[in-house]
Amino acid sequence: FKNRKKYEETYDYEKGKITREQLLDKIPKEELKTVINKEMSEATIKGIFNTIDDIKREKEIDKIDVIIGGPPCQAYSLVGRAQSSHMIVPMEEDPRNELYKMYVQFLKKYKPRMFVFENVAGIKTARGGAAFKNLQTYMKRVGYEIDYHELNAQDFGVLQSRKRVIIVGWLKGTGYEYPSFDVIHSKAEVWDLLNDLPALKPGEEAIEHTMTDMRRLKKYVKDNDIRVKSDVLTGHIARPHTAQDIEIYKRTIDMWFENEQHERLKYDDLPEDLKTHKNRTSFVDRFKVVEGDMDHCHTILAHLSKDGHYFIHPDIEQHRSITVREAARIQSFPDNYYFEGPRTAQFVQVGNAVPPMMAKVIADKIKEQLEK
């Protein structure tokens, strides 16, 4: 939107005052056409190419400078809570395991000067490493030199340990290279991301910030434009929890903060009346508190859409799992980034995302090379 009135209409949508259809009616049709929301498959890719080609002609775009993206993570992901055992999700029956070939088809057709391909660390070992080797071979075959590194969002100023494989490619003969990144370690704590948000009990919701919250605002949140100049607050709805879960959450938080070693609660540590699962080996680390007093927390996962036991809010007075907005802040999303759909879908969006602070640094480095 190019003026303040249109900008305010987005807030009306976020507040639920107008429908999505009413909002889209106010956006110029030529802009809406540039957003292509279609499933990627062999059956649809030709039509997607045709749509892109039409847009290129209408906007008189000759060359594509850069393509950025990556197939959905789940097909290559280390299994949620079994990450420590390095188990890989079975891929043979998952159609998403071929999506990297779709990505290469875009490279082959549009020949961007550079590209960025992002995925989870598990892609390197999926199918014994064959999928990753094939991907690199296909990229080179269509005319690219490539390099890859496993990068951690924590090194980009994000208050979260989040490892991702980033492949950068450039057309042969262009002289580009894999960017070098300066490590950015913030002195902030994860608490700084949570303190100024309204406190919630299980099942409660807050739809706006308060002046009290503003007084708790931390430098990290202001400096990185996470808190915006608006009272609108979306996605800050706490899940309801059973009395049993609440009691377990309190014990989990207590154990984390009661000693400097920050011990995690193990399932067998619970009294018998709180143990409901027979397979206790699988649930050994089922409950985990977000590390509020540290400079980073564990990786935000799409599994948040299933339950929040692995992401318990560190404030024992709130005794609940984190909200979509809190997860988004840990991912470094600004508060005015609106997640659509039901809460489960929002958690999936947040859990699968690249942290914006990390993405911006990578994008700036790519832009520097393209502008030389």
Where are these regions (language model features)?
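Short Gly/aromatic-enriched secondary-structure transition segments
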Residues: 2, 182-184, 314-318
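Class I S-adenosyl-L-methionine
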Residues: 54-61, 78-277
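Beta-sheet entry/capping signal
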Residues: 65-66, 113-114, 297-299
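Short, small-residue-rich loop/turn micro-motifs
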Residues: 71-80, 171, 304, 334-335
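C-terminal target-recognition/interaction regions appended to catalytic cores
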Residues: 220-372
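Short alpha-helical segments and helix-capping/turn motifs at coil-helix boundaries
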Residues: 47-55, 150-154, 282-286
